[in-house]
């Protein structure tokens, strides 16, 4: 309890936009404010520490943040420690605030530590998130709450809203019948991507459940009231009579012979993909000593974004139903919800809020249809803000996968064949499940020249949390199959796990091809292994020395794995952006490059400036209008590692088209007034399309084709300590050697690397969402704190 008359300092009292505290400056300089949701808490915490301990060690900073229970889901923590140490040096007078900040020396900012445009607002507490916006909505705004399912599978017999409608402050209780009466189908369009072997049409998910409950938390009714407290109380008073049904909480239970269809008439195993590459392989032709078979499981990893799901809606000045949310696919979500709520696409507008992290869960619509339906039916502004329990239990999760992989090699360790039979638990709704499962065909065994692959993967409906996109979408499931199999095979054959990977990596001299049958766009892995070799050997020496000094209770080891991932949506992908010259000589970029903390604002800025600088445009002269379907062209979703490739190139092309129009014959550039005087347009579109992917589309029978414009490649070298008595694993050092293409902004690349590493460690060691009675808090879901990762170094 805070004592009476205590002085309380908030982020607003630390520093302002015009007079920042050294900690705030350091937070910007080290790229700490990614989504920015945790920044005020960390900055306040760091200030208290440095006020009392002006010269802390790195370990003392870590311990302090742990003690205060400060959490970050974006950065992987290392930049936060770096920034705190740098701020301490400034506060001790050893350097100035100006020394911390990147100083542009040339006219290009590509590959530099240029600070993202939103950083200053994020570190001063002036960057409003969705719940902040909701507090500022006009008088008469209705607050929404949901009546949600308390079981995982049931038939709905009746819904009685009588008591709820009579409770204080309640304006209306909306159920499925109201949505249908307003012209909606009450169905989310799951957008079937691969129809040939898909047994569903994608319309299983209701906006509001009226006949069945398919998972815990399913929305049954929306209560609109004058306050959130009144709305929540009334939502609890809605009476739902059910007939509870057996709940199939994993894929294997759902495909058991006696399992009933979760969606009547649609089999629970609703999609299948087969990777069929090269000739058949005779597994009896090689001895058992040269082949292995493994079974593995990739858990139902929760995203654990710190900002609970939230949004609001209203009818705008043009009569458009407008929904603000954390969507990372504003144009993608429009066709998914429009018919369901009975709003024509041309009358629907989606806007992305400043999002406190999503890590992919907002590739799926969550609250958009609920808010849109409420706005249409009520014709008043509304807001819907989840608490953390709702956030964890009723947003999508990484789809678990049961992997069964066989791997064979010749007597020297050269890989000959891979076989697989895998099951993906995608929860009760199909949306993007086919695309996810296709990733298992594309990335199981990726990175290695394996000539014969027979790998079958099946997508299964269950009654657990619906499957949604998560960082590296589909590849963790794949690599928990093939990378584990390679380790087991290496151990069985007495080959070093680094050596067997280096021996089998993609090589142009061998004509290596990816699992889908085509050459990679670059052959870079040999160079990566060459670079990683001395780092690996040094790590082996370190862990050997530690083991020699250990009493055996703690054992140390070095791991190695290879990751490859495609950039883009399968096949022909496209993105659009606008560049507009303004009367004052500035340029406005319009881009629906959604930002969930990864740095879309910086992406638009650096991608456009590299061209606009030819016309003398400085970074600070570029204005950004982003993530509004009313003003920005369709750039596609910010998922699938596609944004810098697709939207970055769209911004580049828009800038090129503008600069080309501005350029005079003598090489100088027209002003805005000159453009207008000559009748030239001042706004230009950039459209980037991967037309070359049309040459080799994915074969839905064999998964063969060339689906992505480009790939990323990384060698991972974690050093771990294992307590042999408890089995607890601690990651002590993590080194990566990567080819991620052109680094447009170093702070963004490093920050996303660190954050991805920590989420990968969490997936491996602690994070899961399985027990609905336990896994309902950030802590219980296994979110990592600082003590788990001692140091991580992308190389």
Regions found by a protein language model. Give the residues of each.
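Residue-level detector of conserved catalytic or cofactor/ligand-binding positions
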Residues: 787-795
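Alpha-helix N-cap/start motif
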Residues: 345, 497, 618-619
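Flexible, low-hydrophobicity surface segments
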Residues: 88-266
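Cofactor-centric catalytic regions
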Residues: 79, 84-142, 181-195, 279-294, ...
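A short glycine-threonine-serine/GTX helix/turn-capping micro-motif
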Residues: 30-37, 466-478, 640
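Signature of N-terminal electron-transfer/Fe-S-associated modules in redox systems
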Residues: 1-104
């Amino acid at each position: 309890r805070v004592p009476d008359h205590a002085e309380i300092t908030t982020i607003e009292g630390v520093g302002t936009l015009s007079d920042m505290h050294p900690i705030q400056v350091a937070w910007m300089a080290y790229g700490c404010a990614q989504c920015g949701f945790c920044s005020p808490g960390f900055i306040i915490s760091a200030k208290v520490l440095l006020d009392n301990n002006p010269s802390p060690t790195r370990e003392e900073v870590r311990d302090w943040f742990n003690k205060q229970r400060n959490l970050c889901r974006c950065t992987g923590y290392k930049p936060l420690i770096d920034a705190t140490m740098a701020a301490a040096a400034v506060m001790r007078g050893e350097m100035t605030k100006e020394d911390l900040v990147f100083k542009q020396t040339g006219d290009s900012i590509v590959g530099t530590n240029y600070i993202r445009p939103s950083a200053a607002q994020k570190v001063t507490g002036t960057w409003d998130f969705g719940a902040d916006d909701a507090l500022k909505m006009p008088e008469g705004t209705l607050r929404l709450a949901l009546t949600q399912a308390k079981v995982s599978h049931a038939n709905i017999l009746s819904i009685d809203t009588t008591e709820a409608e009579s409770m204080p402050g309640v304006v209306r209780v909306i159920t499925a019948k109201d949505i249908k009466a307003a012209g909606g189908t009450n169905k989310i369009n799951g957008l079937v991507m691969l129809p040939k072997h898909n047994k569903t049409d994608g319309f299983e998910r209701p906006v509001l459940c009226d006949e069945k409950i398919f998972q815990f938390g399913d929305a049954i009714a929306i209560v609109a009231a004058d306050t959130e407290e009144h709305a929540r109380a009334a939502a609890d008073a809605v009476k739902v009579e059910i007939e509870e049904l057996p709940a199939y909480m994993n894929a294997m239970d759902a495909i058991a012979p006696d399992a009933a269809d979760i969606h009547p008439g649609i089999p629970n195993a609703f999609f299948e993909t087969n990777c069929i590459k090269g000739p058949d392989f005779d597994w009896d032709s090689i001895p058992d000593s040269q082949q292995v078979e493994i079974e593995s499981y990739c858990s139902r990893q929760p995203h654990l974004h710190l900002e609970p799901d939230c949004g609001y809606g209203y009818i705008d000045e043009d009569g458009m139903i407008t929904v603000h949310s954390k969507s990372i696919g504003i144009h993608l979500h429009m066709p998914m919800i429009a018919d369901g709520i009975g709003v024509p696409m041309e009358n629907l507008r989606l806007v992305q809020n400043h999002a406190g992290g999503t890590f992919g869960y907002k590739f799926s619509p969550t609250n958009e249809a609920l808010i849109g339906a409420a706005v249409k039916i009520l014709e008043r502004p509304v807001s819907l803000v989840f608490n953390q329990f709702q956030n964890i239990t009723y947003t999508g999760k990484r789809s678990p996968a049961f992997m069964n992989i066989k791997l064979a090699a010749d007597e020297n360790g050269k890989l000959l064949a891979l076989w697989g039979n895998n099951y993906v638990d995608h929860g009760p709704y199909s949306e993007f499940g086919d695309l996810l499962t296709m990733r298992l065909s594309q990335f199981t065994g990726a990175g290695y020249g394996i000539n014969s692959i027979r790998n079958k993967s099946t997508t299964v409906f269950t009654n657990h949390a619906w499957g949604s996109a998560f960082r590296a979408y589909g590849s963790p499931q794949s690599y928990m199959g093939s990378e584990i199999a390679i380790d087991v095979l290496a151990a069985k054959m007495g080959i070093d796990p680094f050596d067997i990977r280096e021996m089998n990596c993609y090589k142009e001299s061998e004509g290596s091809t990816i699992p889908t049958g085509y050459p990679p766009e670059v052959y870079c892995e040999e160079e990566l292994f060459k670079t990683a070799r001395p780092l690996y050997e040094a790590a082996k020496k370190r862990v050997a020395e530690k083991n020699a000094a250990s009493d055996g209770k703690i054992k140390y080891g070095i791991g190695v794995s290879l990751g490859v991932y495609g950039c883009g949506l399968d096949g022909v992908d496209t993105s659009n952006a606008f560049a507009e010259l303004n009367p004052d000589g500035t340029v406005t970029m319009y881009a629906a490059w959604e930002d969930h903390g990864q740095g879309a604002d910086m992406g638009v800025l650096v991608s456009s400036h590299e061209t606009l600088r030819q016309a003398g445009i400085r970074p600070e002269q570029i204005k950004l209008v982003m993530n509004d379907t009313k003003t920005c062209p369709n750039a596609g979703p910010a998922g699938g590692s596609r944004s810098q490739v697709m939207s970055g190139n769209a911004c580049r092309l828009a800038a090129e088209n503008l600069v080309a129009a501005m350029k005079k014959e003598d090489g100088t550039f027209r002003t805005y007034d000159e453009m207008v005087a000559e009748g030239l347009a001042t706004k230009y579109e950039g459209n980037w399309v991967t037309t070359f992917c049309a040459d080799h589309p994915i074969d839905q029978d064999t998964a063969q084709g060339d689906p992505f414009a480009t790939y990323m490649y990384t060698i991972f070298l974690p050093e771990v300590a294992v307590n042999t008595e408890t089995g607890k694993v601690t990651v002590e050092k993590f080194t990566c050697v990567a080819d991620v293409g052109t680094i447009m902004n170093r702070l963004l690349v490093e920050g996303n690397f660190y954050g991805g590493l920590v989420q990968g460690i969490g997936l491996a060691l602690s994070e899961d969402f399985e027990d609905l009675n336990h896994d309902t808090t950030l802590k219980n879901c296994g979110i990592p704190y600082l003590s788990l990762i001692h140091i991580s170094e992308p190389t």
